[in-house]
A protein has these predicted regions:
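Low-complexity, Ser/Thr/Pro/Gly-enriched N-terminal "stalk/linker" regions
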Residues: 1-85, 108, 206-209, 267, ...
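Beta-rich accessory regions
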Residues: 275, 367, 371-374, 439-552
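Catalytic cores of carbohydrate-active enzymes
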Residues: 3-12, 42, 46-54, 176-191, ...
Length: 552
């Protein structure tokens, strides 16, 4: 039995819930089982690979992060030392990824946040057993995008969409009334925690919380406040653009949202963008930029900001540059060549270490511009490190990937689950596409390479199994071999389940045949990021956006 056959056999005979200790009658267990989710990986000598053990640990600890809050039922908690669900992460990017595993919990988390809204329209920055909290706004990932994604994935529940749309519209009105005191059209930061950038030199000398615990006030005795904040402003741009989509879906007029999004976008580039460096900086009240090179750049790009040219420049000058943000374990929170960089990963810090949230948010930026090979290359070091970890931490050592601050941290847990589906698994998309990704983790270092891995998921009533080694990938559909292609490709199925495109995820060219049962093989040679469109089993064209290798 070769390694692929062994991994596939383990996948078929294994029990995901038994391996994770989740009760099949548990609500989360029921959703995982109904989705047919599984993952197995074997080493060259037939042992269970570290990645398989960590995958099962991730599901088990994810369940620990799902608990009731008040009358809201089961909701996602941030985990570790962070109690409750947080707007910047748990209820947004965390809940978005969770929606592929436990969609009912995603819905409940969103609705719990909306239920905690204050009478004046402000959404809580977190909800805990003690109730909603309002001492800062703490926004990063746009909630409206996550709501829209969940709506499309789960049967288009218009009551859910209307509830969330009304809550988000009221929150937007609160922000417009209280967080644009300078009339720029942007969104202002009044304190460190508004952006969740704890310990970042971006906010040296700035209070952690808003003045006297009031999110509508800043301390007038602090020079420079308020800052026009690029990440907060970018959040609102994307938020309003998605509120326009939601308005159109609900029969409302989307144009006011589009106009307000355009005004915020103009403010972002007028006040926060430095065209010479390509970075985005806070603009202090005296007009000076706060020149701290931080992951604000990636936060902005992950909010659907910028065209392909701007993103390529960001890759070349910053994100894929080893003197800037590309470390051995992923993207740092402060540029490595900034003299204020501090890589201490043993504390809650955005002053340098790699943060799980940065890595979890990154795919939105890269995939919007077709730069999937750079994304896979950038996170390979953390995947390798995490295969040997004993806990799911918030912060990681940029040099080694060692786990640092806290444990049972849901963003790290969800990052591993997301990355293995994104690289070497079956990932259903909100628009109906299914990604079958074959970048099998067979080339990891530190003894963590697998001989083969196998993943399973049921999508639209069809059960897919994807198994591969260092050479090839086999995809079974409802138990029968259906597709075969070389390691390093992603085959994209359209909403009808037919192969529509092939994308190269690998950092080098990959040539081979796309073999579909009952059809003639299609020979392809693809450079990194190249996308071949397939129609009726024939090549319809290839688009090649280019590739940016690591720079120094």
């Amino acid at each position: 039995m070769d390694a692929i056959a062994e991994a596939l056999a383990r996948l078929r005979t294994g029990d995901t819930l038994a391996a994770t200790g989740i009760d099949p009658a548990d609500p989360v267990g029921t959703e995982v089982r109904s989705a047919g989710i599984g993952f197995r990986a074997v080493t060259a000598d037939g042992r269970v690979a570290g990645l398989e053990e960590r995958w099962h640990a991730a599901l088990r600890e994810l369940r620990e992060c799902i608990r009731p809050i008040g009358d809201a039922g089961l909701v996602l908690h941030e985990g570790g030392v962070y109690h409750g669900a947080w707007l910047e992460s748990t209820a947004t990017i965390g809940a978005e990824v969770l929606g592929r595993f436990a969609p009912a919990v995603t819905r409940a988390t969103h609705l719990a946040l909306a239920a905690g809204q204050r009478e004046d329209g402000l959404l809580p920055y977190k909800i805990t057993a003690d109730g909603p909290a309002f001492t800062q706004i703490q926004m990063v990932t746009p909630l409206a995008r996550c709501v829209w994604d969940h709506y499309l994935r789960t049967g288009r529940d218009r009551n859910y969409l209307r509830t969330m749309a009304d809550a988000m519209a009221r929150n937007d009105a609160w922000l417009a009334a209280h967080r644009d005191t300078r009339g720029t059209g942007g969104v202002e930061a009044f304190c460190t925690f508004d952006t969740g950038h704890d310990l970042s030199p971006r906010f040296w000398g700035v209070p952690e919380r808003c003045h006297r615990g009031d999110a509508a006030r800043f301390d007038p005795g602090i020079p420079g406040l308020p800052f026009v904040a690029p990440d907060l402003t970018a959040n609102v741009v994307s938020q309003r653009e998605h509120l326009a989509l939601i308005a159109a879906e609900l029969g409302d007029d989307p144009e006011p949202w589009l106009r307000s999004a355009a005004r915020a976008r103009d403010a972002l580039f007028a006040h926060c963008h430095d065209p010479r460096s390509g970075m985005f900086y806070d603009r202090a009240a005296d007009g000076r930029p706060v020149r701290v090179d931080s992951d604000v750049l990636l936060r902005v790009l992950a909010c659907d900001i910028g065209d392909d040219a701007l993103f390529v420049a960001a890759l070349e000058d910053h994100l894929m540059h080893t003197r800037r943000f590309l470390s051995a374990a992923g993207f740092t929170s402060i540029a490595l060549d900034d003299p204020r960089f501090d890589g201490d990963h043993t504390r809650n810090s955005w002053a340098g270490p790699v943060n799980a949230l940065t890595m979890l948010r990154a795919p939105h930026a890269f995939e919007a511009h077709g730069r999937v090979a750079e994304l896979a290359l950038a996170h390979a070091g953390l995947l390798q490190a995490m295969a040997g970890h004993d806990r799911f931490a918030q912060c990681f050592d940029p040099w080694t990937g060692d786990a640092g601050y806290t444990e049972v941290y849901s963003p790290a847990i969800l990052w591993l689950l997301d990355t293995l589906e994104r690289d070497a698994g079956i990932l259903p998309r909100a628009g109906g596409e299914v990604w079958l990704s074959g970048l099998i983790p067979s080339r990891l270092g530190e003894g963590q390479a697998v001989a083969a891995s196998a993943a399973a998921r049921t999508v639209g009533g069809v059960h897919y199994e994807l198994a591969g080694d260092d050479e090839r990938v086999d995809v079974h559909r409802d138990g029968r071999l259906w597709l075969r292609f070389p390691r390093g490709w992603r085959v994209i199925l359209d909403a009808g389940g037919a192969p529509a495109s092939v994308v190269c995820l690998a950092a080098g060219p990959v040539a081979g045949d796309l073999v579909v049962a009952g059809a003639a093989p299609l020979a392809l040679s693809l450079a990194p990021n190249a996308r071949a469109d397939v129609r009726g089993g024939r090549l319809a064209g290839i688009a090649d956006p280019g590739f940016t290798p690591p720079r120094s």
